[in-house]
Amino acid sequence: MPKFFCDYCDVYLTHDSMSVRKAHNSGRNHLRNVVDYYQQIGHEKAQSVIDSITSSYAAEGQAHANPMLPQNQPGGVPPGLGFPPPGAGVPPFPPFPGGMPPPFPGMPGGAPVPPPGAFGAPGVPGGIPPPGAPGARGMPPMPPFPGMPGAPAGIPGVPPPMPGPGGLPFPPPGGLPFPPPGAGNFPFPPPGAPGAFPGMPPFGAPGQGPPGADKR
């Protein structure tokens, strides 16, 4: 009759049967041997992993196995990209020379930025003198509208606009005529003036019958 060999206990059982196996597997010695066996395997595997990592670090100069990260930085941040410590704040940007930022390269028509005080500074070629300085010219006056006194001639070949009533300029298209002086803001002529609307006759005027006379 074949015998059963227990790998944990390294012994042969008397005979191969379910009752004998069950009795052996529930024994105290067998359980202790099973625990020791798996603990020994776990320690051996852990030690082998530690040895392989140590040897790889020693062979590659403490390099790591991840090719996506930079060399000599096992899982860290590349130099120059470290984060500041908490509470340190963001470092300020370095100031530009002269206080003005340089022009962006590649911009069309980019000219160098003039130094501070170039505009209006005396002795600078091309500088604009400040108002009131010797040789400074003020802003050119606004030209008068066509038709106003002192206005230049209009477009050649185009007759000048006709003056309005009273010598006033011609009103714009769709606009009302300008009222004469003393008429206020009301554009209509006063009663009795030429071209005014006839006024209503007063009550009881000659030629007007009593109220209701036209109903007879």
Swiss-Prot record:
Region Disordered, annotated ranges: 70-89, 125-216
Biological process according to GO: mRNA 5'-splice site recognition; spliceosomal snRNP assembly
- Where does the record say this protein resides? Nucleus
What are the GO cellular component annotations?
A: commitment complex; U1 snRNP; U2-type prespliceosome
Domain of life, per lineage: Eukaryota
Q: What is its main location?
A: nucleus
Where are the Matrin-type-classified zinc fingers? 4-36
What InterPro entries does the database record attribute to this sequence?
Answer: Matrin/U1-C_Znf_C2H2 (IPR000690), Matrin/U1-like-C_Znf_C2H2 (IPR003604), U1-CZ_Znf_C2H2 (IPR013085), U1_snRNP-C (IPR017340), Znf_C2H2_sf (IPR036236)
Pfam families cross-referenced by the UniProt entry: zf-U1
A GO MF label = pre-mRNA 5'-splice site binding
Record text on subunit structure and interactions: U1 snRNP is composed of the 7 core Sm proteins B/B', D1, D2, D3, E, F and G that assemble in a heptameric protein ring on the Sm site of the small nuclear RNA to form the core snRNP, and at least 3 U1 snRNP-specific proteins U1-70K, U1-A and U1-C. U1-C interacts with U1 snRNA and the 5' splice-site region of the pre-mRNA.
What does this protein do, in the record's words? Component of the spliceosomal U1 snRNP, which is essential for recognition of the pre-mRNA 5' splice-site and the subsequent assembly of the spliceosome. U1-C is directly involved in initial 5' splice-site recognition for both constitutive and regulated alternative splicing. The interaction with the 5' splice-site seems to precede base-pairing between the pre-mRNA and the U1 snRNA. Stimulates commitment or early (E) complex formation by stabilizing the base pairing of the 5' end of the U1 snRNA and the 5' splice-site region.
What is this protein identified as?
U1 small nuclear ribonucleoprotein C
